[in-house]
């Protein structure tokens, strides 16, 4: 394409220097037809170049977005960002990289080396005219160098401010009910307006610098034309250059400086893309649960024999240990209820069993294998988990129940719903399992959300059940019915229930009391209950 760009200057030079003085009309038409043919080829090449750039961009977009999502889903919990809104802004930053790749930047990079070709052709026609072109190139490079430092600083500031603004928006949407009930609309509105105003100011500075860069490069390009013409007139007067040669050199000078002008105009996009790429690199460097070089023990089926061996653990960013040398063994098939004060470490036990976090000392064993050595997919396939605050997703009730097993058949879904106590609720709704669940399950009550979470946990009939306050939002009748169904379903499964409700204690064959990250009582239900009632917790074994 850039070689074909030489056609017009050379055509013009030959017309002025040879065709017009000699009235060579036939030569004119031959040259014109040749140039028209080259223009047709140029059009085809430009279309093909655009097509291949778009195709490459689409592939990069798909591959990069897939890798980012894979990294997000695989990130270890301790590396999970505290601010979800800011993190989502980081994830979207790949769009800036994609836009830079698909913009005129690629074309400008391709055209840049050919500036030397145009300078070389100018030198062949009149070497003296190379001097203003080289001076213009140097001037554009210095000008861009001066601007790019400030642009880099503004791009980083814009990125951070945009992430803060996005975090405010996400927090406001997800906590809208709390904001309304607490009368915090004014606080969030003020926070939003301040972040938007700051982003707007920085963006204005970025746009000003970008305009200054683009317009400055255009001025240099125009000046080089003027200087080339002035110098060319003197060369013509001395008989060192023809009129056609001057016109050709003027056209070539513009072509030589144009790619640099384009590059300067793309400085803002470049710095935005560079900042975004740095952010993406931080995301991709986060530790994941299944590193590519890791080798896990493959255990598709687990019995449910669990042991905590002198386990110590602190949550990321916390100096207070959640577990302090905790030791406990749960045999396969046992139903254990874990009780204790708020913040004593009960929920942490279940999270360590799931491999969501790793102990800082000691080991968590299942069937004699350290949880850290088990493939996370195998581990969680064998565990049904109900969290304290279950999260539902936008979609149908069927989709929410089978979110971890999308190929589960209707019979399994119906059976899971029956165990969870959802059958009556489903039968009352005209759409049944196809009823639409709002984002985060806001259209359901707390008890219904818990029932959906229970249905998820039992859907694939896992050998281990971890239930964290599974009935905290249920009424007495629903809780009693659930207890009866759970006793039937549990059978020989290993069940660990974390609760504050005494009504669930009769599900246990054994009770473990946890306090301040340590087991202070561990024994048969009746024995521990008696010790609790008499105040002799330390003697319950």
Model-derived segments and spans:
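Juxtamembrane loop-to-helix connectors within ABC transporter transmembrane domains
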Residues: 71-117, 174
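Loop segments that connect adjacent transmembrane helices in multi-pass transporters
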Residues: 66, 70-71, 75-83, 157-206, ...
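Transmembrane helices of ABC transporter permease
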Residues: 31-41, 107-157, 230-241, 258
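Transmembrane helix-loop-helix hairpins at lipid-water interfaces of multipass membrane proteins
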Residues: 1-48, 52, 124, 128, ...
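Hydrophobic alpha-helical segments in the permease module
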Residues: 35-46, 137-139, 210-221, 243-265
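Cytosolic ends of transmembrane helices, especially the final helix of ABC transmembrane type-1 domains
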Residues: 54, 181-184, 208, 256-285
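ABC-type nucleotide-binding domain
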Residues: 300-541
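Alpha-helical segments in transporter systems
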Residues: 1-10, 14, 31, 35, ...
């Amino acid at each position: 394409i850039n070689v074909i760009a030489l056609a017009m200057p050379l055509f013009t030079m030959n017309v002025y220097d040879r065709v017009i003085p000699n009235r060579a009309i036939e030569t004119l038409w031959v040259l014109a037809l040749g140039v028209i043919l080259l223009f047709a080829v140029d059009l085809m090449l430009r279309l093909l170049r655009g097509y291949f750039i778009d195709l490459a961009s689409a592939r990069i977009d798909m591959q990069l977005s897939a890798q980012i999502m894979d990294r997000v889903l695989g990130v270890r919990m301790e590396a999970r960002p505290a601010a979800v809104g800011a993190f989502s802004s980081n994830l979207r930053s790949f769009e800036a990289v994609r836009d830079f790749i698909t913009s005129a930047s690629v074309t400008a990079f391709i055209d840049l080396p050919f500036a030397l070709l145009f300078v070389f052709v100018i030198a062949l026609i009149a070497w003296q005219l190379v001097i203003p072109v080289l001076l213009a190139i140097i001037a554009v490079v210095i000008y861009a160098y001066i601007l790019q430092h400030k642009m880099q600083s503004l791009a980083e500031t814009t990125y951070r401010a945009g992430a803060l603004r996005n975090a405010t928006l996400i927090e406001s949407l997800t906590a809208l009910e709390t904001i309304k009930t607490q009368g915090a609309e004014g606080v969030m509105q003020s926070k939003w307006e301040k972040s938007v105003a700051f982003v707007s100011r920085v963006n204005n500075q970025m746009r000003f610098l970008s305009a200054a860069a683009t317009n400055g490069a255009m001025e240099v390009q125009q000046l080089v034309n003027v200087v080339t013409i002035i110098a060319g007139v003197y060369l013509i007067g001395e008989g060192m250059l023809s009129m056609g040669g001057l016109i050709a050199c003027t056209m070539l000078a513009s072509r030589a400086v144009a790619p640099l002008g384009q590059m300067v105009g793309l400085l803002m996009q470049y710095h935005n893309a560079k900042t975004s790429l740095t952010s993406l690199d931080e995301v991709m460097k986060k530790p994941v649960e299944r590193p590519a070089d890791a080798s896990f023990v493959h255990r598709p089926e687990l019995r449910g024999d669990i042991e905590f061996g002198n386990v110590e653990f602190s949550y990321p960013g916390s100096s207070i240990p959640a577990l302090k040398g905790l030791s406990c063994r749960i045999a396969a098939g046992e139903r254990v209820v874990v009780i204790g004060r708020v913040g004593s470490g009960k929920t942490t036990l279940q999270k360590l069993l799931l491999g969501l976090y790793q102990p800082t000392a000691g080991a968590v064993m299942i069937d004699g294998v350290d949880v850290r050595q088990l493939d996370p997919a195998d581990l969680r396939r064998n565990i049904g988990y109900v969290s304290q605050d279950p999260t539902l997703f936008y979609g149908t009730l069927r989709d929410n129940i089978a979110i971890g097993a999308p190929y589960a058949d209707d019979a399994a879904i119906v059976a899971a719903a029956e165990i969870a106590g959802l059958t009556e609720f489903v039968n009352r709704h005209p759409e049944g399992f196809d009823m639409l669940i709002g984002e985060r399950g806001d259209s359901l009550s707390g008890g219904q959300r818990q029932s959906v979470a229970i249905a998820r946990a039992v859907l694939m009939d896992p050998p281990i059940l971890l239930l964290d306050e599974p009935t905290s939002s249920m009424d007495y009748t629903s809780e009693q019915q659930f207890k009866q169904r759970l006793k039937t379903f549990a059978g020989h499964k290993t069940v660990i229930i974390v609760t504050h409700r005494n009504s669930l204690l009769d599900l246990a064959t054994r009770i473990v009391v946890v306090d301040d990250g340590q087991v202070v009582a561990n024994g048969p239900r009746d024995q521990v209950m008696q010790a609790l009632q008499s105040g002799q917790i330390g003697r319950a074994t």
